[in-house]
């Protein structure tokens, strides 16, 4: 490349740069020139061309010719278009806000979840091995500790029976439990009932029927079928198993194998020798002619289960003896469980259901006949003398002389009886011993008479108070108290098992238990102890097929070794220590003793009273009376407790309510010694080793029939959500609800893919279930699901039939119970009518909740304040109620009430006791969400009240609700929205209910409270920000404060009636609804005649009658909706009059006319009239619970509306066919509900309302007889109408016949409503008024007001006024008095 070319390169680059710059310059200059030209043109157009165009236009002449008709047509067209735009675009805004699915009842928890529960099988959670079955059965002992449980199970043996074997149940050998298969338990019938079977032999066993079994010449009847996991032995049999046995008893239990040639002879020989020394549980031996004793109870496998075999686990009696020695506290727990089952299951069922109270009372009669022990005469004389002197002193002070009547006195002098010296004190004394009761100086006695041979002494820690009143001399009164306690001890059986008590005390001191007292009242302890430690040989029992043993071999020698070693080191307690321990116990009991005189014809204890105790009769007598379940029945005399006897024994020992009334004779009084039941229970808890002998004594006193019932009854524990019995199951028994609640569910459409579940109702405490199916031998018609943890007493069908044969009165009482249920069901709402009612799922009867839980949605809500107001309201309506919170439970049961298993058992027992004592229990959830008490409250509630702040804009799910959902409770849950004022913002309720499918209902409650810090603040808005800025202006602020003060003064002056409106209290309303004491108001349809409803409602307020639930039809739905929304008669009157004026306007109706294809009018003016009153308010926003009905002509059903826009469904309920078009909703056409039920009393009754005030304003049904032949001429009908002298009534027209046809079902429903119990039927005299006479508002209103005022005044004068809870206070004697409210006079 040459140098010339290289020099030319910079020149080329310079030319290119110059060309580019020039091009840019040209473009910019062109743009600038275009802008100048455009600007010039615009200015030219504005300044020159436009004015010139205007001048040319104005210089021309225009001429427009319009005819008058054209002008009018144009104006009419514009007016019509404007009207249509405004009418259908702007004035129908209320109709466009109905996109949500209104009126569709929420499904809630119970219908949806019940289906899931119905699908559960009771065998789903069936244990799969022996240990699980055993654990399930051992729960009857009450959550034993692991050490005690291991002590019982380590000696357990099992035995398997084939279908050809029969087991002779010997409860003295041990405690038996079925761990596999189903066992049939038979009991021997009496000789009289089985005499016709004497010619049959043992081999002739009837296999055609399982109810009876022939064994030799004895007949056995089926008592019960015991399934796997259930105990085969009676819980009462454990009492005998705890008692140590001597050598003779052990040898008596050993069978003799010598006579092994004959199977029957071997078995009979065994049976004759295997009878325990004590009375067996069902022992009532029936000897035949050969002297052979047949067993009272036999067991055989059920052939249709587990291939006809069963496996039984047996805990030998030695295991129980070791538990009693090592763990005496556990023994007392088991005894407590035995007594708990006795009073909760057996006695409760026998008294309240079977009506065998006399059988229970026989034990107390037997006690007084066999064991009554009177005091020495000098004790009684001295006591009467002191009481006489006391009465004389009181009479002199009050100037009212009184004298006690008493018997002749013994001539013994007090000084003589006071200082008698007895050497017999050295010997062991017995309660009731006359000589041992003589008062002497105790200090001298301790120095002289204690034996010197005592070699073992107690430790310093165990050596407590050794005398009665420290070192003070014992007075005669103290001696009297000790003598009384000794007699009571003897009667209740404490002296009979001193060996057990003494050994219990020793091991108790080793384990450092709560008490180290040792009772030694008998010198037989050493022989009992020696007998208990004697080893025994193995036992083997022959069976019927001679191929195996009746029970597995139990090596008693090996089982006795630990006990023998322990007992060998047991130091013998000296007589001194035994006596001192005896004094300590007597000391404690004597201190709680009250001695008093009761005058003639005085009632000491009333029947069913829980405040009772032990009454020892010192002088005089007490009469015992009993009254049947009928309150009007008189008291029936039972027996008399003479001097030395005890009254109130069963009530104190078992803990049951008093089954009798205890009175003194009409002419003479009585001197009694009284130990309150609470003090008695506390002392037995302290000296818990006394519980076993007391329970053994009670067992020996009970009759065979009661023990048989106790054996066969089942104590069923059903966890929450589990199925008690399923639809279609065999009815092999019926249940009595002891505690808890059950929901009745019925499944329909089983053959279809979608199975419907219908909730029929609920069963609560004390109600019985399933008698009809048992009596008719049919299958279960319903499924029962436990709402919460529940307990029932199951009465097997076989037991019921056996008792009915022996006591026909049982069948009579149960038949009456079933008949009363059938009779009551006639007045209950029909489940299925010929017209299906699509009732909301939340409207089933929620009768009488036993337990109510108050649970907040979030922390910071006034739970305690709400609970206090609710409890006060419940008490005011006459309920016996108690409120429980965590503090009260911890105070009663200790700080470990929710931690330990045994403590939880006590907790459940305490809750069950409270359910017996109180009508309503309120659980207050005042603890954090993680607390055990919160979970306990949720699980214990029959009804859960969920508190929420209605003014809180945040409607999210709170932490307490999350726990509620997590626990999967099936209890009814109601949302309580708390308002500061009695105002509900339209549409503010539905957001709370929208996402809470577990809520079945809601209540609006006014309660002033301060919002907690945890409650979320309200959302900010533009208006609030503007108000905040304006409040900074001083002038505006001062004006605002002045106006606010004026408004407060005005409200105060014009709201003086609040004090008188106690009947409007929201907590009283809530209390009545929860207690089945609600008052319902049902307003019927009738067009303008329904204006009288306003007058009736005004009269209700004047007379202070509360209204808790409102229902209505047609015009009744309108007036009822107004009252439910406003709850203020002034507002109702004004709005009803406004609506009537609008509807009665002729011009409005004329403008609403349309071509009468479906209806005469479009319904626009009618809709606007209703909407002007209710606006966008929803039924959920109404302050009072409300519902209305409509006729669904698409599905041919009656629809009940409880949610959705109020105006829409009230309009549907008022849609008269022909006049108004039907309301279209979800594709269905809704018409006036009066066509199906013009007075929906039946629907109100389904909501559990007790008092229903039904106001009927419908037209009178014309029932004039017609007789015009088989043919009818229309001309004759026309002439008959025109003929004033015709004797024939006017024949109805086609329109009249069609109208009557549509109201056929409504007329029948009205007649049924009049006959419904609890309905107060009102019909004002409004017949002269037509259906559309809305222009006569004031006249019709006054007719209704005057009628209601006169009727209510007449009711009050004649005593027919409804006894509404809260308005009438119940006295103790059953009388009632009207509650007067204080006037606001200042």
Curated annotation (Swiss-Prot):
Positions on the Cytoplasmic side per record topology: 1-19, 87-1386
Which segments constitute the PNPLA domain?
1081-1245
Q: List the disulfide bonds.
A: none
Q: Which SUPFAM superfamilies match?
A: cAMP-binding domain-like, FabD/lysophospholipase-like
Q: Where is this motif: GXGXXG?
A: 1085-1090
Q: What is its EC number?
A: 3.1.1.5
Query: Where in the cell?
Result: Endoplasmic reticulum membrane
What is the first-listed, main subcellular location in coarse terms? endoplasmic reticulum
- List ligand-binding residues for a nucleoside 3',5'-cyclic phosphate 2: 697-821
Q: Which residues cross the membrane?
A: 20-40, 66-86
Activity regulation summary: Inhibited by organophosphorus esters.
Q: How does it sit in the membrane?
A: Multi-pass membrane protein
**Residues annotated to bind a nucleoside 3',5'-cyclic phosphate 1:** 577-701
> Which Pfam family is an annotated match for this chain, by its short name?
cNMP_binding
Q: Where is the active site?
A: 1114, 1232
**Composition bias, Basic residues:** 402-411
UniProt keywords (A-Z) are: Endoplasmic reticulum, Hydrolase, Lipid degradation, Lipid metabolism, Membrane, Repeat, Transmembrane, Transmembrane helix
Where the record places motif DGA/G is: 1232-1234
Protein family membership: Belongs to the NTE family.
Q: What is this protein called?
A: Lysophospholipase NTE1
Q: Which organism is it from?
A: Candida albicans (strain SC5314 / ATCC MYA-2876)
């Amino acid at each position: 490349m040459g140098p010339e070319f290289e020099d030319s390169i910079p020149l080329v680059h310079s030319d290119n740069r110059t060309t580019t710059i020039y091009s840019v310059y040209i473009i910019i200059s062109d743009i600038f020139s275009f802008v100048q030209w455009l600007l010039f043109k615009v200015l030219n157009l504005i300044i020159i061309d436009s004015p010139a165009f205007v001048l040319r236009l104005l210089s021309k002449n225009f001429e427009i010719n319009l005819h008058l008709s054209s002008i009018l047509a144009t104006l009419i067209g514009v007016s019509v278009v404007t009207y249509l735009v405004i009418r259908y675009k702007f004035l129908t805004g209320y109709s466009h806000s109905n996109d949500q699915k209104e009126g569709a009842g929420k499904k809630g928890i119970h219908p949806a979840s019940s289906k899931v529960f119905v699908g559960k099988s009771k065998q789903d959670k069936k244990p799969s091995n022996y240990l699980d079955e055993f654990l399930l059965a051992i729960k009857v002992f009450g959550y034993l500790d692991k050490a005690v449980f291991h002590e019982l199970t380590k000696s357990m043996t099992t035995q398997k029976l084939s279908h050809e074997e029969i087991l002779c149940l010997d409860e003295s050998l041990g405690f038996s439990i079925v761990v596999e298969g189903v066992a049939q338990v038979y009991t021997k019938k009496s000789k009289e009932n089985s005499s016709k079977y004497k010619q049959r032999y043992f081999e002739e066993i009837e296999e055609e029927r399982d109810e009876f079994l022939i064994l030799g010449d004895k007949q056995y009847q089926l008592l019960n079928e015991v399934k796997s996991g259930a105990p085969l032995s009676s819980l009462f049999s454990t009492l005998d198993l705890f008692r140590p046995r001597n050598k003779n008893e052990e040898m008596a239990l050993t069978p003799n194998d010598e006579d092994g040639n004959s199977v029957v002879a071997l078995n009979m020989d065994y049976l004759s020798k295997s009878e325990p020394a004590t009375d067996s549980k069902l022992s009532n031996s029936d000897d035949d002619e050969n002297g052979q004793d047949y067993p009272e109870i036999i067991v055989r496998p059920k052939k249709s289960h587990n291939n006809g075999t069963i496996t039984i686990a047996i805990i030998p009696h030695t295991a129980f003896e070791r538990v009693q020695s090592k763990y005496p506290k556990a023994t007392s727990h088991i005894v407590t469980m035995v007594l708990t089952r006795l009073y909760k299951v057996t006695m409760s069922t026998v008294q309240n259901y079977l009506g065998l109270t006399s059988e229970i009372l026989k034990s107390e009669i037997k006690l007084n006949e066999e064991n009554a022990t009177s005091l020495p005469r000098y004790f009684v004389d001295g006591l009467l003398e002191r009481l006489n002197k006391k009465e004389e002193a009181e009479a002199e002070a009050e100037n009212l002389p009184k004298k006690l009547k008493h018997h002749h006195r013994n001539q013994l002098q007090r000084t003589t009886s006071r200082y008698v010296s007895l050497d017999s004190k050295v010997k062991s004394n017995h309660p009731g011993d006359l000589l041992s009761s003589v008062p002497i100086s105790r200090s001298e006695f301790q120095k002289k008479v204690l034996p010197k041979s005592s070699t073992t002494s107690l430790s310093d820690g165990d050596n407590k108070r050794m005398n009665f009143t420290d070192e003070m001399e014992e007075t005669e009164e103290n001696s009297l108290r000790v003598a009384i306690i000794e007699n009571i001890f003897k009667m209740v059986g404490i002296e009979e098992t001193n060996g057990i008590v003494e050994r219990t005390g020793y091991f108790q001191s080793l384990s450092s238990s709560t008490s180290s007292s040792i009772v030694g009242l008998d010198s037989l302890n050493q022989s009992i102890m020696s007998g208990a430690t004697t080893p025994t040989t193995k036992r083997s029992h022959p069976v019927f097929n001679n191929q195996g043993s009746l029970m597995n071999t139990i090596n008693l020698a090996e089982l006795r070794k630990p006990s023998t070693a322990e007992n060998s080191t047991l130091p013998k307690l000296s007589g001194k220590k035994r006596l001192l321990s005896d004094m300590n116990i007597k000391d404690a009991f004597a201190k709680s003793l009250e001695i008093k005189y009761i005058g003639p014809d005085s009632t000491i204890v009333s029947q069913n009273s829980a405040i009772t105790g032990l009454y020892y009769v010192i002088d005089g007598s007490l009469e015992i009376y009993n009254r049947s379940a009928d309150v009007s029945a008189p008291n029936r005399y039972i027996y008399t407790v003479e001097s030395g006897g005890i009254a109130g024994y069963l009530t104190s020992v078992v803990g049951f309510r008093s089954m009798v009334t205890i009175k003194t004779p009409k002419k003479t009084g009585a001197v009694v010694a009284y130990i309150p039941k609470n003090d008695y229970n506390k002392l037995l808890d302290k000296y818990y080793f006394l519980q076993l002998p007391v329970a053994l004594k009670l067992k020996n006193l009970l009759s065979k029939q009661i023990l048989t019932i106790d054996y066969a009854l089942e104590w069923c524990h059903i966890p929450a959500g589990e199925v008690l019995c399923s639809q279609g199951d065999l009815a092999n028994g019926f249940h009595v609800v002891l505690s808890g609640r059950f929901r009745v569910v019925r499944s329909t459409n089983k053959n279809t893919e979608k199975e419907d579940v219908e909730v029929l109702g609920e069963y609560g405490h004390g109600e019985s279930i399933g008698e009809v199916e048992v009596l008719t031998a049919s299958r279960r018609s319903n499924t029962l699901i436990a709402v919460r943890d529940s307990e029932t007493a199951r009465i097997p069908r076989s037991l019921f039939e056996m008792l009915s044969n022996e006591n026909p009165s049982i069948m009579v009482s149960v038949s009456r119970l079933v008949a009363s249920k059938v009779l009551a069901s006639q007045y209950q709402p029909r489940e299925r009518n010929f017209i299906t009612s699509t009732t909301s799922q939340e409207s089933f009867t929620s009768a009488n909740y036993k337990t109510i839980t108050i649970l907040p949605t979030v922390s910071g809500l006034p739970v305690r304040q709400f609970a206090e107001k609710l409890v006060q309201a419940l008490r005011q309506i006459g309920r016996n109620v108690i409120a429980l919170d965590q503090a009260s439970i911890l105070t009663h049961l200790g700080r470990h009430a929710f931690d330990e298993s045994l403590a939880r058992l006590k907790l459940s027992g305490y809750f069950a006791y409270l359910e017996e004592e109180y009508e309503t229990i309120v659980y207050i959830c005042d603890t954090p969400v993680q607390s055990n008490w919160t979970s306990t409250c949720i699980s214990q509630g029959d009804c859960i009240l969920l508190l929420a702040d209605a003014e809180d804009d945040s409607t999210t799910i709170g932490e307490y609700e999350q726990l509620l959902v997590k626990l999967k409770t099936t209890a009814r849950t109601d949302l309580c929205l708390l308002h500061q004022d009695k105002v509900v913002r339209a549409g503010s309720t539905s957001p709370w209910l929208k996402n809470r499918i577990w809520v079945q209902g809601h209540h609006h409650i006014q309660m002033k409270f301060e919002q907690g810090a945890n409650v979320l603040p309200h959302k900010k808005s533009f208006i609030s920000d503007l108000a905040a800025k304006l409040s900074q202006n001083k002038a505006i602020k001062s004006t605002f404060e002045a106006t606010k003060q004026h408004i407060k003064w005005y409200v105060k002056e014009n709201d003086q009636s609040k004090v008188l409106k106690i009947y409007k209290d929201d907590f009283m309303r809530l209390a009545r609804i929860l207690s089945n004491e609600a008052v319902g108001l049902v307003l019927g349809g009738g067009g303008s005649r329904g204006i009288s409803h306003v007058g009736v409602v005004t009269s209700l307020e004047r007379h202070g009658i509360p209204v808790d639930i409102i229902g209505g039809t047609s015009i009744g739905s309108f007036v009822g909706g107004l009252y439910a929304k406003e709850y203020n008669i002034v507002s109702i009157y004004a709005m009803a009059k406004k609506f009537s004026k609008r509807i009665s306007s002729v011009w409005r109706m004329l403008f609403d006319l349309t071509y009468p294809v479906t209806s005469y009018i479009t319904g626009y003016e009618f809709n606007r009239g209703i909407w002007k009153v209710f606006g966008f308010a929803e039924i959920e926003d109404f302050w009072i619970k409300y519902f209305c009905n409509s006729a669904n002509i698409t599905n041919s059903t009656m629809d009940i509306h409880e949610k959705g826009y109020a105006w829409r469904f009230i309009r549907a309920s008022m849609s008269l066919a022909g006049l108004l078009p039907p309301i279209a909703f979800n594709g269905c056409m809704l018409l006036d509900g009066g066509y199906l039920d013009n007075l929906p009393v039946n629907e109100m009754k389904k909501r559990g309302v007790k008092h229903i005030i039904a106001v009927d304003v419908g037209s009178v049904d014309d029932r004039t007889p017609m007789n015009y032949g088989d043919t009818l001429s229309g001309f004759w009908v026309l002439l008959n109408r025109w003929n004033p002298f015709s004797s024939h009534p006017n024949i109805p027209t086609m329109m009249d016949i069609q109208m009557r046809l549509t109201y056929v079902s409504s007329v029948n429903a009205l007649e049924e409503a009049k006959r419904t119990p609890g309905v107060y039927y009102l019909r004002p005299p409004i017949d002269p008024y037509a259906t559309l006479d809305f222009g006569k508002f004031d006249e019709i209103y006054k007719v209704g007001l005057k009628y209601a005022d006169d009727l209510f005044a007449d009711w009050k004068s004649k005593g027919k006024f409804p006894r509404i809870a809260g308005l009438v206070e119940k006295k103790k004697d059953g009388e009632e008095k009207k509650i007067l409210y204080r006037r606001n006079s200042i």
